[in-house]
Amino acid sequence: YLYDDLWECDKVEYALNTTNFFICKILPVPFAKCCTMGTAGQWKAIMMAWSYENGLAIPKAENSGAFTGGLSRLLRVGFVDNVIKLDYNSLYPSIILTWYISSGLDISNSMVSMLEYVLTQREKYKDLKGEAGAKAKKIKKLLETFEGSEEERRNLKIEQQAWEAEASANDKKQLPLKILANSFFGSFGAPNVFPFGDLICAEKTTCVGRMS
């Protein structure tokens, strides 16, 4: 019974906590802490570790304040058909990188480089997810008109499931990186929580976003 319990716990952990373990690999905190801390806390831990390793002082926390946010308009109330949704891929992180929105508090210019690393890693796993998903769909379409033996069909089905599992695994890896990258802007706008926060940088990010 003990082996069964351990096996079940291992599978549940693998399904639900893989992403936390993945993020914890780049955080200077214990795994248990990584599972419970917020994303602003994660960026704080990364930057504090960087500062200590490079002999840099930690900026003094500042009070938070209001700034102009994203553009929002309600043009019509009620049921609306023929609606099209357009979504930018990591809008705010992309704006920060494109326009190099960097705080003067970051004297080593490390924050933007770290954000670029996170986004680059995310795109890598997104590409792997897409490749695996495409292969799974190709096999699925092949099975619709497949006229081979039952053993060949069974082997193709196993291969399809393997590619689907690969796509799912890479999706789970890209998602926490997406969340971490998107929270970079939130950290900018919370200098009371994130010592490297900068309201001017946060407002410049939303300003460019409104004009995009």
Describe the function of each predicted region:
Residues 1-97, 150, 158-212:
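Common nucleic-acid-contacting/processivity interface regions adjacent to the catalytic cores
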Residues 124-134, 139-163:
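Extended, charge-enriched "interface" segments that sit outside catalytic cores
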Residues 91-140, 178, 182, 186-187, ...:
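Metal-dependent catalytic core segments for phosphate chemistry
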Residues 28, 110-112, 144:
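Short, charged/polar low-complexity linear motifs in solvent-exposed/disordered segments
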